[in-house]
């Protein structure tokens, strides 16, 4: 959420307050699919420990992808701001896709924190937590909400906000 937050004086093209349009990278899309299928399989078998393990591995991988991609974007942006914006846009597309799916997967375990994430996505919970949309790309999901990709605004997140500290 902080990555797209509008900042006065920041000329970055990614700071629109909206989830950026675009397709998740092949690595992120594959991780999403594997996590959803693995989680679904584990839950079907009532292997809750395995389902949580799938989520843990997915979240750790998503965090590493975000860390690596955002650092690369910042480094590239010092020499070529347009290239930095392109890389940051892709990092954000991946991060929002992975966060949405992780939130759906973890909703049964930590409902309050996940519902707070949904609130800051500014999407109705009925749509956000629907398994009908879990494997859709973010662009497909935003279109299903009746909006154009790249135009869905998220709520402004307060500084140092923790969704799970309650």
Regions found by a protein language model. Give the residues of each.
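Basic, alpha-helical terminal appendages of large translation-related enzymes
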Residues: 46, 56-166
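Long, charged, mostly alpha-helical binding arms that flank functional sites
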Residues: 1-87
